[in-house]
Amino acid sequence: RKGGDIAVETTKWLNENGIPTQLHIVGIKSLDDKIKNLPFVQDIGFLNKNNKTEYNRLIDEIYHCHALILPTHAECSAIAFAEASAYGLPTFTFQTGGIPNYIENGRNGYMLAMNSTSEDYGRLIAQCLKDGRLERMTNSAKEVYLEKLNWNVWAKKMNNLITDLTDK
């Protein structure tokens, strides 16, 4: 459901096309050996954000990455997209479910059509690297987070909604 196969194949495509790329896989307790043993895969495993040591490891991983690729096939509300923006990681994903609430094409990542392939992802990422969009999205992703993807903004919106409803 999360599109791990596409993420792996995209990373493979990028490497085969002259763009040295590592895929850091976070969140899977037991990654299949055939994936884990690929030379471009870093198996981080599941990290519990409630455990300070594991949380710090997650933050360290984020700081050493340049983008989030999460080609999920079904997603209502992915906190990972908001967190990626907070740390300046552009996100590459499918346009499905609630994802358009989190990703603004060209600002904090890109949403691809559901029929897109790993090569489509690879070509887009390669083009973003070549023309500087990836670097620009690093800054604008943080802006998107500050404008709309953080808990303070959510609290203000909820407060306004409740106030509007109770004033009627």
Language-model-derived ranges and their functions:
Residues 1-37, 43:
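Conserved catalytic-core segment of nucleotide-activated headgroup transferases in glycan assembly
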Residues 31, 151-168:
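C-terminal alpha-helical cap of glycosyltransferases
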